[in-house]
């Protein structure tokens, strides 16, 4: 069995144990690397307050923030803005605001859009525009209003009784005379003339 380089150490192949002794620094004290700056005028993240936009040396209320409203951690605990930040998602995430619930500061444009809806036209809010064509609401008929039929009124009379139809005259049990309006049938109740054949109408008789 020939010897190998693993079994017999050689000065050409020193064996590494994997454990290295730490080398002390020159000054004798542990030094930390300087924190990396995020940009001009912005310090390192401290983990306190609003983590998006809090420069060093300034308070959270004066700092410039991209989120609408005051930063997290400011204001009373019972305020609605603080309650939105402390929802079921935790205080680290701010709840979403739609364009109708998020108030915008006075004199500034809301970043998410406008929160005012367009009002309907004034004619659509008039209760009698569809029924009375604007006569009572606007002081006169509009030029595009449909004209009513002759003899009909647009306003229904209040508490006016409806006209009843005239009562029908009932005939007594002894009066069996036919009514004058009933048509008379020529072959019912009286002797009707015998119908002539076509030959008789032409003047030809069967006798010749």
From Swiss-Prot:
Record's compositionally biased regions (Basic and acidic residues): 1-18
Region (Disordered): 1-122, 135-208
Name of this protein: Putative uncharacterized protein FLJ46214
Protein species of origin: Homo sapiens (Human)
């Amino acid at each position: 069995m020939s010897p190998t380089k693993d079994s017999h150490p050689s000065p050409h192949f020193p064996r590494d144990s994997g454990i290295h002794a730490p080398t002390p620094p020159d000054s004798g004290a542990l030094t930390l690397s300087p924190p990396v700056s995020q940009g001009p005028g912005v310090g390192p993240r401290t983990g306190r307050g609003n983590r998006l936009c809090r420069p060093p040396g300034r308070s959270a209320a004066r700092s410039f923030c991209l989120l609408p409203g005051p930063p997290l951690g400011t204001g009373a605990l019972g305020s609605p803005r603080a309650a939105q930040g402390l929802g079921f998602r935790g205080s680290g995430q701010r709840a979403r605001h739609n364009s109708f619930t998020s108030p915008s500061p006075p004199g500034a444009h809301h970043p998410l859009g406008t929160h005012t809806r367009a009002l309907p036209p004034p004619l659509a809010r008039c209760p009698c525009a569809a029924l009375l064509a604007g006569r009572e609401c606007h002081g006169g008929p509009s030029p595009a209003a449909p004209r009513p039929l002759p003899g009909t009124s647009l306003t229904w009379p209040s508490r006016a009784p409806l006209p009843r139809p005239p009562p029908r005259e009932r005939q007594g049990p002894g009066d069996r005379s036919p009514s004058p309006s009933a048509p008379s049938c020529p072959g019912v109740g009286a002797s009707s003339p015998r119908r002539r054949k076509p030959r008789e109408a032409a003047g030809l008789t069967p006798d010749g």
